[in-house]
UniProtKB/Swiss-Prot annotation:
InterPro entries: Bacterial_rp_bL28 (IPR050096), Ribosomal_bL28 (IPR026569), Ribosomal_bL28/bL31-like_sf (IPR034704), Ribosomal_bL28_bact-type (IPR001383), Ribosomal_bL28_sf (IPR037147). SUPFAM superfamilies: L28p-like. Belongs to the bacterial ribosomal protein bL28 family. The gene is rpmB. This is Large ribosomal subunit protein bL28. It comes from Lactobacillus acidophilus (strain ATCC 700396 / NCK56 / N2 / NCFM). Residues 1-24 are annotated as: Disordered. GO terms for biological process: translation.
Length: 61
């Protein structure tokens, strides 16, 4: 299971609820993209969330 390298976001689980409130298991997945970033001065390919990319927490190489 992929996990965000910067923020640590990963898949969370819960219940989907029908109109009659019957629970069914489901998953919420973060929007992760595989990008190359600089880690300790060297390029590395890691999973990063689009929110981290858009906010400028990491820069692509």
């Amino acid at each position: 299971m992929a996990k965000d390298y910067v923020t640590g976001k990963k898949t969370t689980f819960g219940n989907k609820r029908s109109h009659s409130l019957n629970p069914t298991r489901r998953a919420w997945k973060p929007n992760l993209q595989k990008v190359r970033i600089l880690v300790d001065g060297k390029p590395k390919r890691v999973w990063v969330s689009t929110k981290a990319l858009k906010s400028g927490k990491v820069t692509r190489v």
